[in-house]
């Protein structure tokens, strides 16, 4: 399944608030479509699927990528669900978003893909790059790159900077000081249900 490029508010209406996907809120609180307001009891599978979809759409990863992250999280020490969230949060596109350099993760991904972002002084155009403690995230020393980020900063996606990051608005330089803590993950998600969803598939 490839990355979603359709109407974002339809997804928000179905899955709830996704801070990484869009800053807009759905006016209607029920799912889109003819049967959007149906109140039938959902199966456990449907609930797990919904949590998995939240993760996919919020971070903008494909099904294939998410499976890779689940496998990687399983091999790591610690809670699989928490490690999975950390892997997604420490992606470069998400880090750029959390630093306030872009209003959404798709916007941050575009900045990265178009070569506007540097890591430790070098241009990195791979959105899935895993940021590590000590990494310095900056903006390419070109007027266009600087202007793009400054404009984005006028409309930040999330108000608070996570505790593992620091950012200097004057120099447009951020630093990764550690790994994100669970309490700083902005998405409302039950990661255990995602792990359960993949338990027989991965």
Swiss-Prot record:
**One MF term in GO for this entry?**
structural constituent of ribosome
The record's annotation in PROSITE patterns points to:
RIBOSOMAL_S4, S4
Q: Does the keyword RNA-binding apply?
A: yes
Which processes are annotated in GO (biological process)? ribosomal small subunit biogenesis; translation
Which InterPro entries does the record associate with it? Ribosomal_uS4, Ribosomal_uS4_bac-type, Ribosomal_uS4_CS, Ribosomal_uS4_N, S4_RNA-bd, S4_RNA-bd_sf
Task: Name the domain of life.
Answer: Bacteria
The segment(s) forming the S4 RNA-binding domain are: 90-153
In terms of SUPFAM superfamilies, this protein maps to: Alpha-L RNA-binding motif
**By its UniProt entry, which Pfam families does this protein fall under?**
Ribosomal_S4 (PF00163), S4 (PF01479)
Region called Disordered, residue ranges? 23-42
Keywords of this protein's UniProt record, alphabetized?
A: Ribonucleoprotein, Ribosomal protein, RNA-binding, rRNA-binding
Which first-to-last residue range defines the signal peptide?
Answer: none
Q: Please describe what this protein does.
A: One of the primary rRNA binding proteins, it binds directly to 16S rRNA where it nucleates assembly of the body of the 30S subunit. With S5 and S12 plays an important role in translational accuracy.
Family membership, please give it.
Belongs to the universal ribosomal protein uS4 family.
Subunit and interaction comment: Part of the 30S ribosomal subunit. Contacts protein S5. The interaction surface between S4 and S5 is involved in control of translational fidelity.
Give the HAMAP family listed for this entry: Ribosomal_uS4_B
Can you say what this protein is called? Small ribosomal subunit protein uS4
- Provide the species name: Microcystis aeruginosa (strain NIES-843 / IAM M-2473)
* Gene designation: rpsD
């Amino acid at each position: 399944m490839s990355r979603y490029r359709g109407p974002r508010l339809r997804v928000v209406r179905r899955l709830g608030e996704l801070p990484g996907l869009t800053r807009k809120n759905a006016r209607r609180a029920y799912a889109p479509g003819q049967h959007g307001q149906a109140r039938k009891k959902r199966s456990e599978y449907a609930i797990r699927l919904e949590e998995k979809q939240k993760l996919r759409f919020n971070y903008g990863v494909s099904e294939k990528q998410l499976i890779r992250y689940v496998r990687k999280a399983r091999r790591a020490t610690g809670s699989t669900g928490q490690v999975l969230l950390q892997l997604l949060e420490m992606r470069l596109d998400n880090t750029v978003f959390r630093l306030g350099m872009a209003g959404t993760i798709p916007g941050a991904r575009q900045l990265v893909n178009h070569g506007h972002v540097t890591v430790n002084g070098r241009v990195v155009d791979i959105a899935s790059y895993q940021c590590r403690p000590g990494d310095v995230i900056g903006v390419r020393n070109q007027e266009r790159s600087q202007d793009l980020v400054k404009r984005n900063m006028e409309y930040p996606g999330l108000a608070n900077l996570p505790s593992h990051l620091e950012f200097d608005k004057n120099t447009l330089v951020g630093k990764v000081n550690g790994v994100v803590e669970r309490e700083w993950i902005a998405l409302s998600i039950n990661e255990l249900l995602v792990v359960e969803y993949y338990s027989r598939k991965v």
